[in-house]
């Protein structure tokens, strides 16, 4: 027997990318504004929407384009010693014989050094009236092999900031700075978000990534429906990815069909803009 319930279609728009997810919520369908209990029921079913990967990808889509930069900050021997010295002075076990404790402490000290460098960069950019926008991760792991490597940082930052990073990192003797523009032909930057998170070793209670406060934070819209019809891309949009939403509850017979209930697409307005740009450049 099917359990009483309803479906929620959650829509996100971040930059040129849209997403829709449809999930089942047990209980009586709201007549108007959902009650607190109904909101809590929705919240329990939406956990997959708040995965670090999806949230990071949305943040990238909403704030950065192909003109912006993927930037790397490495530590020289001198720069690493500076990190270790700060860690020792502040009681972090950077010299511990326990490898996990030592690596966690070094990563924490390096994150502190990055914070100092970012403040320098912001002051430098203030001179030219440019604001720093960025997302950054601190890594001590090879994302492919999983091996521990020298601590370093990966950042996505706005265009025009590379010289400030050179001045505030390399010229301070901390190490090297490298950068490249975000891939112009990659409208969907979910793979870039995956790449960044692959570099981050899991540490209890530690954030996987951080960002500047001035970024646009995408906000979702919810719509309640009664049926489990297949999600469709908005008219004029272009499908990028479709996957099945798995019913872990096993209580709604229709829902056990596990129809594709997550889609990611290029929004119609983005495609119209791209077409106008092509016509203008022709």
Task: Show the residue positions of the predicted features.
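Right-hand nucleic-acid polymerase module
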Residues: 1-149, 159-282
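Conserved, short, structured surface segments that act as functional micro-motifs
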Residues: 152
